[in-house]
Amino acid sequence: MKDIKPAILLFIMFTIICGGIYPALVTGIAHALFPDQAKGSLIIDKAGKELGSNLIGQPFSAPQYLWPRPSVTAEFGYNPSASGGSNSGQTNPDYLKTVAERVKTLRESGMTGLIPTELAQASASGLDPHLSPQAARLQAARIAKARGIPETAVQKLINENTAGPQLGILGAARVNVLAVNLKLDTLTR
């Protein structure tokens, strides 16, 4: 019994520290130093309505919008509670059929030349909010035609919303799909 008492006390102490004090402290620091990120990097309109997050992709399939990277999350696409890829190998016949269908859809939308991999294949998380600038620019002609605006206006908007590598060296340039689509709506209103 004398060996069990210290073990139980340590268990209770570490549960309080690791399960209560530490998470509360880290959350408090995050809210103090990074309030926007701690709340999910939400995009909120002028009326206070949440439109989405800079960190989670959303489905867009209408021709007047920038199309995101495909999502294969469980139940429905871009489901943040079921983040994950399909785990299908690149030689899986179902996977190859799905990729071929996506490429066909992109070709039918007017896209020519090499199709960037990110427009035909889902990511590991299934929630990517970004595209490469090249993948975004390839969609400019379709978006401009659907909206009845010059392609140069769409290209300019994509360029304005292109972020470079993090800290100048980490990753590649990227375009946030939701941010561009929200700004596209302001161009044609």
From Swiss-Prot:
Q: Which Pfam families match?
A: KdpC
Main location (coarse class)? membrane
Taxonomically, the superkingdom here is: Bacteria
Topology within the bilayer? Single-pass membrane protein
Print the keywords alphabetically: ATP-binding, Cell inner membrane, Cell membrane, Ion transport, Membrane, Nucleotide-binding, Potassium, Potassium transport, Transmembrane, Transmembrane helix, Transport
A GO term from the CC aspect: plasma membrane
Q: Which GO terms describe its molecular function?
A: ATP binding; P-type potassium transmembrane transporter activity
Q: Where in or outside the cell is it found?
A: Cell inner membrane
Q: In this entry, which stretches build a coiled coil?
A: none
Q: Where are the transmembrane segments?
A: 6-26
Matching entries from HAMAP family are given as: KdpC
Q: Which family does it belong to?
A: Belongs to the KdpC family.
The UniProt function text for this chain reads: Part of the high-affinity ATP-driven potassium transport (or Kdp) system, which catalyzes the hydrolysis of ATP coupled with the electrogenic transport of potassium into the cytoplasm. This subunit acts as a catalytic chaperone that increases the ATP-binding affinity of the ATP-hydrolyzing subunit KdpB by the formation of a transient KdpB/KdpC/ATP ternary complex.
Assembly state and interactors? The system is composed of three essential subunits: KdpA, KdpB and KdpC.
The protein depicted here goes by the name Potassium-transporting ATPase KdpC subunit
* UniProt source species: Trichlorobacter lovleyi (strain ATCC BAA-1151 / DSM 17278 / SZ)
